[in-house]
């Protein structure tokens, strides 16, 4: 259910703030968003997979906390990220 290494590397390269950046909130949120989108397709085919649904809810919660942190830290970076990811906030 996880993303492969090439997909992760592409996401990190796109959202990184500098060359070796893998831990900034933008990168973490982008990786979580990709994983969430991947899992949503899984749940269309496997509606009864409640164990994975719990993992999905944990990812959504973690992304929400990171978004709240980024919003409080730097509003312009937050708004730019929301626009780039296509999130509805």
From Swiss-Prot:
Keywords: Ribonucleoprotein, Ribosomal protein, RNA-binding, rRNA-binding. One of its GO terms (cellular component) is cytosolic small ribosomal subunit. GO terms for molecular function: rRNA binding; structural constituent of ribosome. The keyword RNA-binding applies. GO terms for biological process: translation. HAMAP family: Ribosomal_uS15_B. One of the primary rRNA binding proteins, it binds directly to 16S rRNA where it helps nucleate assembly of the platform of the 30S subunit by binding and bridging several RNA helices of the 16S rRNA. Part of the 30S ribosomal subunit. Forms a bridge to the 50S subunit in the 70S ribosome, contacting the 23S rRNA. PANTHER family: RIBOSOMAL PROTEIN S15, BACTERIAL AND ORGANELLAR (PTHR23321), SMALL RIBOSOMAL SUBUNIT PROTEIN US15M (PTHR23321:SF26). Belongs to the universal ribosomal protein uS15 family. This is Small ribosomal subunit protein uS15.
